[in-house]
């Protein structure tokens, strides 16, 4: 089943009108950090204005005189396949596209980051499905919730991670591209057993990110799980206990420090 644009597009779009001026657009550029804005009239898309359109233009020039008109624009629809849209963006060089309905009403905007995020997140459900299947086969009653969890309440079950992958996860966190982790919550205490996503969790811990998106499997039990017992044998109580291994030599552990920007220190 294909992923639709509507599942990942931003619905609250910053727009301008044809009567706004270049000065107004410059102000919005500074306030939002965006590099282009759809131009709407009564909810209908009539054009788009970008930073390239206003370079060298008089501050008082009207947007309608510098914008790219609707007939010359590339747009997409909510029910379009997000990967097809990604290919269009790659070929045209656009970093984002307006999303319109059948009557040309602007209903959202989709960016290349949204396309990437859709592909990252789709890998998680299969892992989750396998973990759920395992615990159901062991006779546990469970439910699954997608929520934010406190990074400091995560208990690792893996004693080492790789330095190069950690840097990659730090980058993803900064860009908002990290997929949700998978954790288990029992009735034993106020903590979460980290099952999948150790690089992401340690990256968040090192960067001072307080919460992470997670699929939490709630098990209806107060018994200590096997993976908890294994973690105790490895003396894993918090993310601080996870060793960062130089990927060139998995058998040697270097002390590697990171600042909040993910830079080696």
Curated annotation (Swiss-Prot):
SMART domains tied to this protein: CBS, ParB
PROSITE patterns linked to this entry: CBS
Top-level taxon of origin: Archaea
InterPro entries in the cross-refs: CBS_dom, CBS_dom_sf, Diverse_CBS-Domain, ParB/Sulfiredoxin_dom, ParB/Sulfiredoxin_sf, UCP004699_CBS/ParB
Keyword Repeat annotated: yes
Keywords: CBS domain, Repeat
Name of the protein described by the UniProt record: Uncharacterized protein MJ0188
Natural source organism: Methanocaldococcus jannaschii (strain ATCC 43067 / DSM 2661 / JAL-1 / JCM 10045 / NBRC 100440) (Methanococcus jannaschii)
């Amino acid at each position: 089943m294909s992923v639709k644009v509507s599942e990942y597009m931003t619905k609250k779009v910053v727009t301008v009108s044809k009567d706004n001026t270049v000065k107004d657009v410059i102000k919005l550029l500074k306030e939002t950090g965006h590099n282009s804005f759809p131009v709407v009239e009564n909810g209908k898309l009539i054009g788009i204005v970008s930073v390239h359109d206003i370079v060298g233009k008089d501050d008082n020039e009207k947007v309608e005189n510098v914008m790219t008109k609707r007939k010359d624009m590339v747009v997409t629809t909510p029910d379009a396949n997000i990967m097809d849209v990604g290919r269009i963006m790659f070929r045209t060089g656009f970093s984002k596209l307006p999303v319109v309905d059948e009557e040309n009403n602007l209903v959202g905007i989709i960016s290349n980051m949204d396309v990437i995020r859709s592909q990252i997140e789709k890998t998680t459900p299969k892992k989750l499905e396998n973990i759920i299947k395992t615990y159901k086969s062991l006779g546990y009653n469970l439910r699954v919730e997608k929520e934010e969890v406190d990074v400091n309440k995560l208990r690792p079950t893996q004693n080492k991670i790789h330095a190069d992958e950690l840097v990659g996860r730090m980058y993803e966190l900064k860009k908002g591209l990290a997929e949700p982790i998978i954790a288990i919550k029992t009735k034993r205490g106020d903590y979460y057993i980290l099952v999948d996503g150790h690089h992401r969790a340690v990256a968040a811990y090192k960067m001072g990110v307080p919460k992470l998106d997670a699929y939490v499997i709630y098990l209806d039990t107060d018994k200590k799980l096997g993976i908890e017992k294994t973690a105790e044998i490895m003396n894993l109580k918090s993310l601080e206990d996870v060793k960062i291994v130089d990927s060139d030599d998995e058998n040697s552990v270097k002390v590697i420090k990171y600042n909040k920007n993910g830079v080696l220190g």
